């Protein structure tokens, strides 16, 4: 899990720069397809090293999603509906975590290979569906076309943009706000099923759903209320 988080964190700002320059619809679709494909391939892994490198690839592909998806939402929603739309979108993260806990149940009934295969196939199918349902906001595309030449001249350099970002206090406050709960949050989500199983003698098939549902439910409520 650590290699995924390190690469995800390193790639996130790079993914943001990519999302500013290419079609975000295809970044979302491609990101979902690749990380679902990687999930599927994990079912064929024979050793730790194969799982390790597949998780590393997943970190790259997942990092491309959030900047593209959130900026698309911002283009389609203005005013009060924007916060709610982002909140509703983020509920998917926690619903997915809750459902993901049942992966332990599926693994107990069938095998962990089957679990990776099923979740991967569902994700790849959904990415194909998004090809037909997801699109860029045409108003933004039209607004950018006439001033494309001027926009290239006015666009700040990479170092200029980073300098402007790092000199903004709001950026550091938000960064700390996300970092502080993430430190215990990721540790809890990763190890709580194992803790329940080994310390409380709860079968992993039950420990998985119990640990993910409890955290995901409160997070689900929080992002909805925050969006409102």
Identify what each model region corresponds to.
Residues 5-13, 97-98, 215-224:
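Residue-level signature of mid-helix packing/kink "hotspots" within the transmembrane helices
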Residues 10-46:
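Conserved MFS/SLC helix-loop-helix module at the cytosolic interface between two early adjacent transmembrane helices
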Residues 16-17, 21, 105, 227-228:
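Membrane-interface helix termini in secondary transporters
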Residues 47-55, 173-174:
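Short hydrophobic/alpha-helical segments at membrane-entry points of transmembrane helices
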Residues 54-92:
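Cytoplasmic helix-loop-helix junction between adjacent transmembrane helices
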Residues 89, 93-138:
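Helix-loop-helix hairpin linking two adjacent transmembrane segments in secondary transporters
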Residues 141-173:
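Juxtamembrane intracellular "pre-TM" segments in multi-pass secondary transporters
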Residues 166-223:
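Extracytoplasmic gate region of multi-pass secondary transporters
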